[in-house]
UniProtKB/Swiss-Prot annotation:
Belongs to the phosphoglycerate kinase family. Pfam families: PGK. This is Phosphoglycerate kinase. The keyword Nucleotidyltransferase does not apply. InterPro entries: Phosphoglycerate_kinase, Phosphoglycerate_kinase_CS, Phosphoglycerate_kinase_N, Phosphoglycerate_kinase_sf. It comes from the Bacteria. Its main location: cytoplasm.
Length: 405
């Protein structure tokens, strides 16, 4: 594949400007208070490194999906305030991206100062990978660093097109991006065995390609969450009103067959917590998967399944987990996900957690510090596991024949 250009390889000149593409797409409540700042904290090492090299830093990110230009609820101003608090320093903020205000703010930026531009997606050119928009961003700085792993699977202007305006000595990946790519590479190419993959979440469709790519590489595969019911249907169980992707029943069966052929042990739920509706007030009961009542739906794994999955994890040396075991947002259906988090955290394995929902489960379970690595990217993390090349990584990779001797 070649080698990823690293921020450490750049010979920065004191007083020059660095443009860092970050992923500050953080959740906020209705009052625009940031409810989880993991992504902000994850960007700090690269920002600090560039400041220590004597540069001034321009930060850029998107937040949410604004439809038509500026929308106050998608402004990055709360991010600037949180970053200032986390870094214990002033973070300048401009309510603009490529207009006069932004150009002026960049021009006036002094050595060792940090400026955050407003939401890149307020400009249509960002998601269109528009070279003119990218050129305007590139004109701000002498160097370009991408530390936004969460958007590397998207060919957007600040991720892909912008790199065409920098040579290999002036562009690179930040520490977070390199860490993310290395963890994914080690998982799929050099896992310490036994290697157990845990797949959950609502849909098979979102993880189908990842499951297919992982199957020849893992020793065990654990399937939970809403997606498990498509597998249960595939082997002939009645699943009531549980989530079902009818068009993927055959694919689910193929995965089970392929697992058997490869000698991979595949674990699916043996019991479930079921209810007639997805509600905290709903009546619920624990049944075996053979006894799901008509009109009821499975919303969490049951205690027998928790015990089975814990046993499957007991000898693991590498664990990859993507997707909760149930509707964890509702307390009464969160037990399976939280117990799974505890089991993975207590293992002696290298543990890699992917996906925003899964990271939320781990945080809620109080296990964040016990996991080896929690990925900041959902879609990007899955695509790497699927074996795909990410546009944002490709443009920062020197092919072997381009490497300097």
């Amino acid at each position: 594949m070649g080698e990823i250009l690293s921020v450490k390889d750049i010979k920065f000149k004191k007083g020059e400007k660095v443009f860092i593409r970050c992923d500050f797409n953080v959740p906020m409540d209705e009052f625009l208070n940031i409810t989880d700042d993991r992504r902000i904290r994850a960007a700090i090492p690269t920002i600090r490194y560039c400041l220590d090299e004597g540069c001034s830093v321009i930060l850029a990110s998107h937040l949410g999906r604004p439809k038509n230009g500026y929308e106050a609820k998608f402004s990055l101003e709360p991010v600037a305030k949180r970053l200032a608090r986390r870094m214990n320093r002033e973070i300048k903020f401009v309510n603009d991206v490529i207009g006069k205000e932004a150009v002026e703010a960049v021009k006036n930026l002094k050595e060792n100062e940090v400026l955050l531009l407003d939401n890149l997606r307020f400009e249509k050119g960002e998601t269109k990978n528009d070279p003119e928009f990218a050129q305007k961003l590139a004109s701000y700085a002498n160097y370009y660093i991408n530390d936004a792993f969460g958007v590397c699977h998207r060919a957007h202007a600040s991720v892909e097109a912008i790199t065409k305006f920098y040579d290999n000595k002036h562009k690179a990946a930040g520490f977070l991006l390199i860490k993310e790519v290395n963890f994914a590479a080690n998982l799929t190419k050099r896992p310490v065995r036994p290697f157990v993959a845990v797949a959950g979440g609502s849909k098979v469709s979102g993880k189908l390609q990842a499951l297919k790519n992982l199957l020849p590489k893992v020793d065990k595969l654990i399937i939970g969450g809403g997606m498990a019911f498509t597998f249960l249907k595939a082997i002939g169980y009645e699943i009531g009103n549980s989530l079902l992707e009818e068009d993927l029943v055959e694919e689910a069966l193929n995965i089970l067959r392929e697992g058997k052929r490869l000698g991979v042990k595949i674990y699916i739920p043996v019991d479930a917590i079921v209810a007639p509706a997805i509600s905290q007030d709903s009546v619920m009961k624990n049944v075996t998967v053979q006894e799901i009542p008509a009109g009821w739906m499975g919303l969490d794994i049951g205690p027998a399944t928790i015990a089975l999955f814990r046993e499957a994890l007991s000898d693991a040396q590498t664990i990859w987990w993507n997707g909760p075991m149930g509707v964890f947002e509702i307390d009464k259906f969160a037990r399976g996900s939280l117990r799974m988090s505890h089991a993975i955290a207590e293992s002696n394995a290298t543990t890699v957690v992917g996906g925003g929902d899964t990271a939320d489960v781990v945080e809620r379970a109080g296990n964040s510090d016990e996991m080896t690595f929690i990925s900041t990217g959902g879609g990007a993390s899955l695509e790497l596991i699927e074996g795909k090349e990410l546009p944002g990584v490709r443009v920062l990779t020197i092919k072997n024949d381009e490497m300097e001797c």
